From Swiss-Prot:
One of its GO terms (molecular function) is nucleoside diphosphate kinase activity. It catalyses: a 2'-deoxyribonucleoside 5'-diphosphate + ATP = a 2'-deoxyribonucleoside 5'-triphosphate + ADP; a ribonucleoside 5'-diphosphate + ATP = a ribonucleoside 5'-triphosphate + ADP. Keywords: ATP-binding, Cytoplasm, Kinase, Magnesium, Metal-binding, Nucleotide metabolism, Nucleotide-binding, Phosphoprotein, Transferase. This is Nucleoside diphosphate kinase. Its EC number is 2.7.4.6. Major role in the synthesis of nucleoside triphosphates other than ATP. The ATP gamma phosphate is transferred to the NDP beta phosphate via a ping-pong mechanism, using a phosphorylated active-site intermediate. The keyword Transcription does not apply. The keyword Phosphoprotein applies.
Amino acid sequence: MAVERTLSIIKPDAVAQNAIGEILARFERSGLRVVAARMVRLSTEQAESFYAVHKERPFFNDLVGFMTSGPVMVQVLEGEDAIRKNREIMGATNPKEAAAGTLRHDFAESIDANAVHGSDSPETAENEIEFFFKADEICSR
């Protein structure tokens, strides 16, 4: 398997729970490495741009409102099969359907406030990483 990178966002609900450390520890325990990270407060424009793929969906405005409601922690994760591994750690989008021990099962409040975001494909990962980080801000290790 190839080493991949994926974008991960710890959303405002999980940040408010002081869950950042535990979430990052779970990534690292699974073999993923954090190679870039920062805390940001997204503007409405940034959130609309980042989630533009969902612009026509009925939940778009609520998503933008939620993602701008507090700070988020964004990080680039690197490792073997990182995209799939991160999505397994996150669990199902709906926390009621997420397996025990997944991030969404343990930290999400609802399908809307679902604790974490992760890229769903190599192409998406590349675009999402470039949205938040310049190449020289990513430090492979």
